[in-house]
Structure formats: structure tokens, C-alpha cells
Amino acid sequence: GLELSDKWESGVEERNGTMIRFRVDEELFGEYSYNMDYVEQMVRNYTYLNLGLKIRLNGQEYVSKNGLLDLVNDNMSSEPLYAPIHLTGEDIEIVITHGGGYGESYYSFVNGQYTPQGGTHQAAFREAIAKTIKEFFRKDYDPSDIRTSIIAAVSVRINDPIFESQTKTKLGSKDKEAGV
């Protein structure tokens, strides 16, 4: 894009960061419309993955103080069966709880990229949950029973990830189960 001005907007509280205004070139794209639900979800995801990041979109401010814990809490449709477990490491962040539903609900990310189709990192996480519960209780529970009603978020940072398509919706890297 073209830089139109290097002056600060009036009323800006802080003099750091970047302000971006985006307008579609109607000569190139004609009458273009935004899917604002999609844009808002992307903005929310960026704030969940970058603690303290503030993004203003159409006058609404988005910020997360607790990372993926906020993502899980914001997407709970009912009270969890137990307080979400939030684990962070150098290259990984995980939040897990169980709700009152019957399915499995995952939010997965690789290097800040939302991977709605999951991938090897999510598969490794699912296996690790089942294995941990089975070993802890010394019972041969069926993994699907353990994961029923799970609500979890997984974010990994890995070098040179390999995705299964150009859209980066599913991680295909097999290196050490993609960080999990």
C-alpha cells in the first residue's frame, strides 16, 4: 500500500504501534464486500495469540490478557465441568476443559496461523490427553470417552512447518509430533 501520512491521528492515546486503514481499489476489485464475522474472528485470534495486543476494528477494541484461556472461556456455551487447565511453555500453549456437550471442540494454531482442520499437532495432543488419563487412573478407558465434551486450544511454534495445502488449514509436519 501507499503511505498517505506519517502524522498521528488526533485522540490517539499512545504514540506507538501502527495504524492501518484499508480500502479496496474499486477499479481492480469492483464492488467488494468484507465478511466482517471472519475479519472479527481473525482479529480475536491475533489478540489471543499475542498477549496485550490491542486491535481496534470499526470502533471496537479487542485485547486478551490471558491468551488461549480467554479463547476457550469466550467460546464456552455452558459452565465447564472443571476450571480450564492452562499450560504454557517456550513453544507451546494449551488450554483444556470439558463441558456438557458430546463432541470434541478444538482451536488449533501453528506459528499464529489458525488451523481449523487441525493436523499433526492436534492429533498428538488428542493422543496425549487419552494416554495421560489412562496412565493416571491405570484404567483402559476408550479414548473417545475421555475426549467426549472436551474443549481445548493448542498453539505451537515450530521451525519450518509443513502444511497440507496452500491455505495452511492443516499441519502436516511429522517432526516430533509437531511440538506436542
Model regions: which residues?
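Sequence-level detector for tyrosine residue identity
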Residues: Y32-Y34, Y38, Y46-Y48, Y62, ...
